[in-house]
């Protein structure tokens, strides 16, 4: 039952916490030469957790053991993946499997699109560096992976995998820390999208507490679906980094939800792990066809968003340029000697988010460029940001991306950790429509939790990047 003795986090406490994290971030900047990039990342974890605490619904009700357990598990997963050779090799094998999936998808793409889907033939026609056509090389992977996942779901293979890892995570957290439903959803989000994963717990969504709903939403925003993972890998992202950040996000989303909105009620699924068995298809063939259709709708959605958002960026940049020219004209008329800087959306994002990139452990020289990508990811979407990130990784050998230009390799890899997630403004509407359809009675709660979920999902990817920044060579 709710704790009636608590009235929420006091305004003075919030002010002190905000002041504290600003001082912490400033200190990290001034001592950057002494602490190095790993030290920056350590400060970053404290900064991001402090920001979550400052935005907490009620700090007095936070179960700090749950927070410590989740952070410890997240760090342990990062340590195992990045520092233990056997585990790292295992993730490399999984990355190779995903890459093989890309090859299978390319076979289908070449049948439909012909030479356009063949990198070598496309370069011969369009010139060196122009062989990778995003719409016919990367996006068809979504259709194929969606079909495979639909078959795995129909055969209950995906549910079994999710159940196993959810059970393990619940044992680590303890039944008092998190509920079965939110743990299942957090695990499902590693493999599935933010509107597909909740299907695993569909019967329980209507009765979830506010804290559980927030965990469900954060889990969706802190990760990407299997199909999108494959697309990012096809665009040149390191498979190990993509897989690692998705796995690390599962415990992170859970403990951040308990920090932002502490659990004060008794969840219906306390200590229980039960997967909903709802199958929409009659057989495997029907599942494959349905999955392919769903994947096609996602591909069309991605194409539409990229066209709209990238065109929108060009429009906004043009308006900002005209505004800057007008201001400089007025300044010159008045007789002042200085000139107003040429504004662009990229310039604004780089200034606003470069401190965040710095606190992830990114080198200070690269922070403005990575900060620009973080801003695009949060305000626009992850595809726009990843498309720009790909521009920094355009050298290809044997149809594979190699090398990075313009920034350090370390900064590039940390950006992958931070950008792999659905945490952007449009995801609030996507979740409101998708999860709200499963439990119409909770639509108002979902709407009220939207901005907190966005914050939690964004912080989860930043903390993932910071942990990688500590562990990465």
Segments predicted by a language model, with ranges:
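Hydrophobic core segments of alpha-helical transmembrane domains in multi-pass membrane transport
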Residues: 16-29, 45-55, 70-82, 142-151, ...
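Structural signature of hydrophobic alpha-helical transmembrane segments
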Residues: 34-46, 137, 343-344, 416-424
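Short, membrane-interfacial amphipathic segments enriched in basic
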Residues: 44, 87, 156-158, 274-290, ...
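Hydrophobic alpha-helical hairpins/lids featuring a short glycine-rich hinge
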Residues: 94-95, 99-170
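Transmembrane helical segments that form the transport core of multi-pass membrane transport proteins
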Residues: 293-402
